[in-house]
Amino acid sequence: RQGTEVSLASPGTWPLTPELTAECLLEAQPIFERQAAIWQNVLEDRADNRELEELDGFINNTSIRLRLICKETAVELPGDMYANCWEKHEIPPCTLVKLPHHGHRDSITPHLLDMLAPKTVVISVSNTRTDDCPAASVLQMVREKGCALYVTDAIPDSNGHVSNHPAIHFDI
């Protein structure tokens, strides 16, 4: 909408209700400065393919990582960050994590899954995707850790058959 005010997100913790807190976590400033410089070059028609490929390689890591905490329950919402980006941080365990990037092979690593130690993992993905999302290796890793696994669309089995699946619904 024209005239809508845009403001930059900044890291911090905000009480949303007496029992619900939101933590906003971002990567270090240099990644955002580089992103801004590339976008400025695009707007001024000075960007080259090399810069656009560079941006494509890191833009998902500019996602806001949001953690919602209500009493003993923590929900980790990492946007589209690649696992190798956010696993560099000390992250406390959570109750539920929504995997980034539709469960792509780069969305989680064994180290990150160990650190998060979630009881439940959610993957937002459509079964009409033609890429490897969710990745079979990710599904296997999550199942081997004993996490409850929910997807937002059915995943075809090895024979291509799509059956009913557990779904998840959030009420806040």
What are these regions (language model features)?
Residues 25-26, 106, 115-119, 123-161, ...:
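C-terminal functional module detector
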Residues 37-134:
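Active-site-proximal loop/helix segments of hydrolase catalytic cores
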Residues 1-76, 147-172:
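Flexible, acidic/histidine-containing loops and adjacent segments that form or flank the divalent-metal
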